[in-house]
């Protein structure tokens, strides 16, 4: 097992960031409510629901969008005009008023170091062996199958991708879907239904939450990555049984992620696996961010911990991160995969993956496995590992509060204040760095952050340059609260 670094505790930052956070929210909410009170007196139409109609929005969420998100929305949805590689061209936008739609200015694009995308292994490119194979596939297969996989839409590249994916992750068979989100939301209802129990990590992705709701079964949540609480929930659930009847559950399914995308944390798989075996539950792991990014051979969290993949019942992953493509997969025993081919909504009713995208994922996978006859895949994996740990260590030394584990390519940096979401994003753009800032509802209202995504395509020179810029920004807007102290750069 590889050594893991302890996760930073947000509670250790001291009282000042939290105090300023609540002051900022109080100021924003007070001003927003005052403005809307005056607006209602003036008869502003957007503040009144037409007579006889139900409101279209939940009031708090609508207020948040109008009075908070509206002021800082330029920090999101920035269009790019290039390949999403190590460096990207960002198209400038502007609006006359914060509440109005942002429009492209037509000005010169801004060349930025890309620290925001999921291009973990650097396969987002338009040249090289993988890109050449993709271009050739357009002439052979076209870009559209015109049908579902269950009918006549299963292309040769998709079939090959399913076979190679199963071999890569160490399972008997795999099924491929055209969309990562739909892989979870459409698969879970085919796995479990009435009489079953899902026990889900509290920070699981929205696609998993949607899939859980679609099953119609009982869903319980355990504290994030807390194996002790997971066991407590399982024990209590087994003792109580199903609601009202108290009959035994038909099955219990534990759902976790390999790497949690907003926290950068690696799941505590050894302890969770021991609990799964002890209580004879099933285990479903979403490896969207860990497959291709964790472990010496890139085989995800089971590779990272040295666990036999046969011990995991269901492995799910996506091709949208490390592989530079689209879509997702589920890998398991052949009998279960055959069941999904007939029962999963995302397989039966959705179009199959574009052959071109299947070739991209297939060829990237061959490179990672070394089946292209080169050591390019091994070099990419090592570069990603080295880059991630180098960037994490350097930015922590500067005094920033960061989350996550060693070896994770996802490195969240806590901003704490909603005003600093836009400030950090805008200052980074001025310094030619493209970053993703994250706030409510993707994170708790009190924990806004930025999320750096490291890539094998970054050089050490790229990262050193970015660290210098981020260091200056951290001093300018007071972000260095590591261990409860504000640390001025030396």
From Swiss-Prot:
<comment type="subunit">
    <text>Forms a heterodimer with sptA.</text>
</comment>
<comment type="similarity">
    <text>Belongs to the class-II pyridoxal-phosphate-dependent aminotransferase family.</text>
</comment>
<keyword id="KW-0663">Pyridoxal phosphate</keyword>
<dbReference type="GO" id="GO:0030170">
    <property type="term" value="F:pyridoxal phosphate binding"/>
</dbReference>
<protein>
    <recommendedName>
        <fullName>Serine palmitoyltransferase 2</fullName>
        <ecNumber>2.3.1.50</ecNumber>
    </recommendedName>
</protein>
<dbReference type="GO" id="GO:0046513">
    <property type="term" value="P:ceramide biosynthetic process"/>
</dbReference>
<keyword id="KW-0746">Sphingolipid metabolism</keyword>
<keyword id="KW-1133">Transmembrane helix</keyword>
<keyword id="KW-0443">Lipid metabolism</keyword>
<dbReference type="GO" id="GO:0030148">
    <property type="term" value="P:sphingolipid biosynthetic process"/>
</dbReference>
<dbReference type="InterPro" id="IPR050087">
    <property type="entry name" value="AON_synthase_class-II"/>
</dbReference>
<dbReference type="GO" id="GO:0046512">
    <property type="term" value="P:sphingosine biosynthetic process"/>
</dbReference>
<keyword id="KW-0812">Transmembrane</keyword>
<keyword id="KW-0808">Transferase</keyword>
<dbReference type="InterPro" id="IPR015422">
    <property type="entry name" value="PyrdxlP-dep_Trfase_small"/>
</dbReference>
<keyword id="KW-0012">Acyltransferase</keyword>
<dbReference type="InterPro" id="IPR001917">
    <property type="entry name" value="Aminotrans_II_pyridoxalP_BS"/>
</dbReference>
<feature type="modified residue" description="N6-(pyridoxal phosphate)lysine">
    <location>
        <position position="321"/>
    </location>
</feature>
<dbReference type="GO" id="GO:0005789">
    <property type="term" value="C:endoplasmic reticulum membrane"/>
</dbReference>
<dbReference type="GO" id="GO:0017059">
    <property type="term" value="C:serine palmitoyltransferase complex"/>
</dbReference>
<keyword id="KW-0256">Endoplasmic reticulum</keyword>
<dbReference type="InterPro" id="IPR004839">
    <property type="entry name" value="Aminotransferase_I/II_large"/>
</dbReference>
<keyword id="KW-0472">Membrane</keyword>
<dbReference type="InterPro" id="IPR015421">
    <property type="entry name" value="PyrdxlP-dep_Trfase_major"/>
</dbReference>
<comment type="function">
    <text>Catalytic subunit of serine palmitoyltransferase (SPT), which catalyzes the committed step in the synthesis of sphingolipids, the condensation of serine with palmitoyl CoA to form the long chain base 3-ketosphinganine.</text>
</comment>
<dbReference type="InterPro" id="IPR015424">
    <property type="entry name" value="PyrdxlP-dep_Trfase"/>
</dbReference>
<comment type="pathway">
    <text>Lipid metabolism; sphingolipid metabolism.</text>
</comment>
<dbReference type="GO" id="GO:0004758">
    <property type="term" value="F:serine C-palmitoyltransferase activity"/>
</dbReference>
<feature type="transmembrane region" description="Helical">
    <location>
        <begin position="10"/>
        <end position="30"/>
    </location>
</feature>
<dbReference type="Pfam" id="PF00155">
    <property type="entry name" value="Aminotran_1_2"/>
</dbReference>
């Amino acid at each position: 097992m590889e050594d893991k670094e302890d996760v930073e505790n947000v509670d250790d930052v001291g009282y000042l960031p939290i105090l300023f956070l609540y002051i900022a929210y109080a100021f924003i909410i007070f001003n927003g409510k005052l403005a809307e009170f005056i607006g209602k007196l003036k008869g502003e139409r957007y503040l009144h629901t037409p007579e006889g109609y139900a409101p279209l929005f939940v009031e708090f969420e609508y207020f948040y969008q109008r009075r908070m998100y509206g002021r800082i929305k330029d920090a999101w949805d920035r269009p790019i005009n290039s390949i999403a590689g190590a460096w990207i061209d960002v198209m400038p936008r502007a609006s006359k008023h914060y509440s109005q739609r942002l429009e492209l200015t037509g000005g010169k694009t801004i060349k930025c170091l890309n620290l925001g995308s999921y291009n973990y292994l650097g396969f987002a490119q338009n040249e090289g062996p993988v890109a050449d194979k993709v271009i050739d596939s357009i002439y052979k297969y076209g870009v559209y199958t015109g049908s579902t996989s269950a009918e006549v839409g299963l292309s040769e590249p998709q079939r090959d991708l399913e076979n190679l994916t199963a071999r890569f992750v160490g399972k008997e068979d795999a099924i491929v879907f055209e969309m990562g989100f739909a892989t979870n939301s459409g698969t879970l209802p085919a796995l479990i239904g009435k009489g079953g129990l899902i026990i889900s990590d509290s920070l699981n992705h929205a696609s998993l939450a949607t899939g859980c709701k679609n099953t119609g079964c009982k869903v319980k949540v355990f504290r994030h990555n807390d194996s002790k609480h997971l066991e407590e929930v399982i024990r209590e659930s087994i003792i109580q049984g199903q609601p009202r009847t108290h009959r035994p559950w038909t099955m219990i399914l534990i759902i976790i992620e390999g790497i949690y995308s907003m926290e950068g944390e690696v799941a505590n798989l050894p302890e969770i696996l021991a609990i799964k075996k002890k209580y004879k539950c099933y285990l479903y792991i979403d490896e969207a961010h860990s497959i291709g990014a964790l472990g010496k051979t890139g085989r995800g969290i089971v590779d990272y911990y040295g666990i036999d993949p046969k011990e995991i019942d269901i492995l799910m992953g996506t091709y949208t991160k490390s592989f530079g493509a689209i879509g997702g997969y589920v890998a398991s025993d052949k009998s279960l995969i055959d069941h999904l081919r007939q029962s999963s909504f995302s397989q039966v009713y959705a179009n199959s993956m574009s052959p071109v995208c299947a070739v991209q994922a297939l060829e990237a996978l061959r490179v990672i496995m070394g089946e292209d006859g080169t050591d390019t895949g091994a070099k990419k994996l090592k570069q990603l590992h080295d880059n991630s740990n180098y960037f994490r260590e350097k930015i922590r030394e500067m005094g920033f509060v960061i989350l996550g584990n060693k070896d994770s390519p996802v490195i969240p940096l806590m901003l704490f204040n909603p005003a600093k979401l836009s400030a950090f994003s805008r200052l980074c753009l001025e310094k030619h760095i493209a970053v993703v800032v994250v706030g409510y509802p993707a994170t708790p209202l009190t924990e806004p952050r930025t999320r750096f995504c490291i890539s094998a395509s970054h050089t050490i020179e790229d990262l050193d340059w970015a660290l210098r810029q981020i260091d200056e920004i951290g001093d300018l807007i007071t972000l260095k609260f590591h261990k409860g102290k504000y640390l001025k750069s030396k």
